[in-house]
Structure formats: C-alpha cells, structure tokens
Amino acid sequence: MHVDTRLDVVVGGQFGSESKGRVTLDVIRKRLSQGHVVFSVRVAGPNAGHVVIDEAGHRWAMRQLPVGFVEPSAVLFIGPGSEIDRRVLASEIEAVEAAGYEVRDRLYIHPEATYLEPHHIVAEKHSDLTKRLGSTAKGIGAARADRIWRTARRVSDVPALFENLGRIRNPAPVWNAPGWAWVIEGTQGYGLGLHAGHYPYCTSSNARAIDFCAMAGVTPWDLPDIYDSFRVWVVVRPNPIRVAGNSGELAGETSWTDLGLEAERTTVTQKIRRVGQFDPSIVNQAIYANGHRVVRIALAMADQVAPALAGATEASEVADLEPEQAMVLRDLVEKIPVPYLIRQIGTGPSTHIDLTGDDLFDLLDAAVATGAEVDL
C-alpha cells in the first residue's frame, strides 16, 4: 500500500493551554494506524508544558520531550529552532524510562538547537519580566537573545552534555520521504505570538504553524499536494486562559468560581490561571493566520459546557445530551468563526469525538429537538 508524506502541525488558537498535547497524540496515533513512519516533533523551549495521558492512565506534563514518547514506534525529534534546558530534558527522560518507555535510542536532537544555559534562567529571574509581563522566567527569551547576538552555544558546541540523552543529528535530511508523517506540537497559542497584536504581553517568538515548521526545519511546499498532505490543527477551548499576574488583556475575564469550574494551574509554574469568556475574534485571527484552507479545528474541553460528554468517544453521545446542555454547546459552536472546520471535540484529558462541523450541528439539533418533543 502506497502511503504519502504527511505534515501535521498542532497550534493553539488562543493564549495557550488548549489541550495541544492530547490533540498531538491523537494525530500521531491516527498516522501510525495509517501505516506511516511517524516523527513526533517538539520545537521552541521549556516554558510550556504539554500534557498527555498514557494507556495506563498516567498524566505526563512534558516541557522538552515530544509527547509521542508514549507511542513506542514513534521517532522523537527536537528541532533546530528549539532551546534545550539539558537538566529538564534529562529529568524527563529519566522519569519516562523509569516508567518503562525507551526513548534514548529513538530521540534525535538537532545539532543546531540552542543550549539553554543556567545563566539564561538567572538573567530572567533577576529581571522584572515576571512582574511586568507574567513571564515564566525559564530562560527562553534570554537564550534567544544570545542566539541573535551569536553568543549562544548550540548543542553541537557542547555534544558531551547531550550525547547520552539521544542522537545528536538530523534524523531526516530529506524529510519528505514517502510514508513519513511529521507531527509538530506547537507551543503557546496564537495570541501569545510576538507579532499577534498583544505585545509586550506575549512570548518571544511567533506561534503559527509556519513558524513551528521553520523551527522544525521542514516546509509544506515540499509536499506533493499541500492541500491534501498538510494539515494545521487549531485547538481552542470554551474559556481561554492566560497565565497569572500582569499577563495582558483577556476578553470577558471572569473567575473559575463564576464558571462553576475547578481552578486550573499553569503546567510549569503551578500558578492559578486567569480565565475569560470565549472570544471569536482571536480564534478567527488564528484560523486565517494559520492558512484557513489547510486548517481543521479541535474544540477541546467540550465537557466543561456539556458535562454529560465527559469521557465520551462516540458521536451518538452528542445526540443523547439533555436539551439544556445541547443548547449551551450549540451556542458555543455557533460562535466559532468557521464552524464547518471542526473535526474533533475534546471530552476529557484523554478522550475525544471525531466528527465534522456539519455533523456536530445535526447531532446538537437532534438533542434539542428531543427535548422539544418531550415538552409537547
């Protein structure tokens, strides 16, 4: 069976923490089931944690290691546009190997990746970044500044520090071989991009699919059919968040108590997140900034507005919703700028339902109609 090259990029459509880790793992598993050789790619730095739940139900929050480590046949790759804190990467490898995952023989670290050194973290912690902008102060901005000044050290400059963690080389100089699938887990969210309109309350890079492709060293223009082989998953959530503190404007800011939800904490700093109302404008910007025609939307955490969907995996369960919950979810879906691009709704930390936007409307309408019949 002939299997074409695929390139999938998972991006955040708001301000981060939209469940990109789970969606990335979903895509990896789909490509593996189609017979691809899958490259699970992590880019950028350790200021963002990506959460996945493995088959044993264990929750992993990874800052450096690609989330595909839970799939033993996936090739793991940290791209050239990454900043690597060696201590973080080593601790993650030790933790997952203690749980039975073998990663060193299948982890490739690009020699051009930037070595994030302890002094980068110290520089940010001694600055006013956290107070002024809500920064996590993990050294990424300082490392990138050194890279721009050409004073940063690359992995290839300090190979002895990394050679026992993985293979220091590009796993695929010709990346678009038939049968290969690259799944890139982007970091942050579109609204945190350096040029997305929220400066200075932003991260130190842009956060679109094309930016993450550059960080990974790949390009969709090398694919045989860009509209068929390239897919950007824009992940959004009902109530977007921003990190704690003075981290910038958040439309319709509210509280976890008012929403009736348990307060969330940031993956890296463990501070309580700020939370807001769904804002169609930032999602619309994210869709078009990421290519529109190649975009598919994953609506995460649908169970927060329709609790009966918690753990659901079948589309039929949407039609079985109580009318009140179906109406709330339908109202949310209608706010999404291009709802027909929806291909998935998340129903929990490790569960989701695959469907199309049209199917979702039909299922929700069926649930609402059932309630109307009962009223009659």
Residue ranges and their predicted role:
Residues M1-L376:
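Non-transmembrane, aqueous-exposed alpha-helical and coiled segments at domain scale
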